[in-house]
Amino acid sequence: MGVMIPFRSILNSLKSYEAGKPIELVVREFGIDPNRIIKLGSNENPFGCAESVMEVVRQAISKMSFYPDDSYLDLKTAIASKFDLTTDRIIPGNGSDQVLDFVCRCVLDQGDSVLINRITFAMYKIYALQCGAKIHSTDSVTHDLNAFLDLAKLIRPKIIFLCTPSNPAGDALSKSDVYEFLSKISLDTLVVIDAAYMEFGKKKDPNKFIPAKEVTDLFPNVFYTGTFSKVYGLGGMRIGYGIGNQELISNLYKMRPPFSVTNLSALAATEALKNESYVESYLENNWNEMKRYEKFAAEQSIEFIDSYANFITFFARKRGKSSSEIAHSLLKQGIILRDLKNYDLNALRITIGRPEQNDLVLEALEKEFH
């Protein structure tokens, strides 16, 4: 007998988010020893988190039976100290994507317009469609703020999403260009700046750094999101945050379920913020190893996007093999990269790994691109 539940009609136009392939799947499909698998498809920190973070979590294991402090005051105080903010301008979430969900449900009504880049983080579209919004996008792979501005004038969007540095392309917008753009946007449009990769962009080019406090002070219609999944190595703990004006934050809290961040996640994130030297070491490795991928691309005449994140995007066009074919070939060797076919790109997104991982990945890629 078929299911008779009257599901919402909007579900007919929705797709589930497709995450990067996990190690467990590769073990099941190809029987490869998990210790031999190189996972560079999800932009995780290949070194993991700081040892002090693991120690804090180990010591707190016995607290798993208790609900967390739902005020998350210690965590918010640590984030506030990092950004020179008051805690009433911060909301934590189960990953920054949960905070993005809060934003959409807080702001969007049926039929509202949302403006995104054509190639961008998939959850913006998914969350907006769940709210019944209409999606409008620019035509370019990388961000074109002039195109954003033209469309914004035409459709008067309720929300604009800017992902900088961008995922999955890796491009980044300069602070001056973003501020000029924001000055031309109506105050009744919320502009979300997704800064999941901001630490990487700042290290490479300080002109790409958009300070959370400054931008939200200057532009009250800006909401800034960050994560502990990338530079801090806490992807598996699922913790992120949002920063905005007090009125916006207080309304977002109305959308937040209780205890949305676990005890251990909150403790880990709070401790992670005390380890900037660890972060700096990882950033140094990222940019040193990025040069190897850029050199390889130049030698092989591979088109790529200048990246300001912890990954690089290689285009496979004119190479004889599609990105899907290359990704599958490497997958059988235990190397997980991200095929961008779901973004309508014949391209691979490659997380920058540890030096010894990159040795093997570059060797395998040379055979595929030769």
UniProtKB/Swiss-Prot annotation:
Names of required cofactors: pyridoxal 5'-phosphate
Any matching Pfam family: Aminotran_1_2
Domain of life (superkingdom): Bacteria
Positions of post-translational N6-(pyridoxal phosphate)lysine modification: K230
Full protein name: Histidinol-phosphate aminotransferase
Keyword Amino-acid biosynthesis annotated: yes
Name of the encoding gene: hisC
Alphabetically ordered keywords of this record: Amino-acid biosynthesis, Aminotransferase, Histidine biosynthesis, Pyridoxal phosphate, Transferase
Self-association state and partner proteins as the record states: Homodimer.
Residue stretches in coiled coil: none
GO process terms (BP): L-histidine biosynthetic process
Top EC group: transferase
InterPro entries: Aminotransferase_I/II_large, HisP_aminotrans, PyrdxlP-dep_Trfase, PyrdxlP-dep_Trfase_major, PyrdxlP-dep_Trfase_small
This enzyme's EC code(s): 2.6.1.9
SUPFAM superfamilies: PLP-dependent transferases (SSF53383)
Record bears the keyword Transferase: yes
Pathway field: Amino-acid biosynthesis; L-histidine biosynthesis; L-histidine from 5-phospho-alpha-D-ribose 1-diphosphate: step 7/9
A GO term, aspect molecular function: pyridoxal phosphate binding
Similarity comment: family membership: Belongs to the class-II pyridoxal-phosphate-dependent aminotransferase family. Histidinol-phosphate aminotransferase subfamily.
Reactions catalysed, as given in the entry: L-histidinol phosphate + 2-oxoglutarate = 3-(imidazol-4-yl)-2-oxopropyl phosphate + L-glutamate
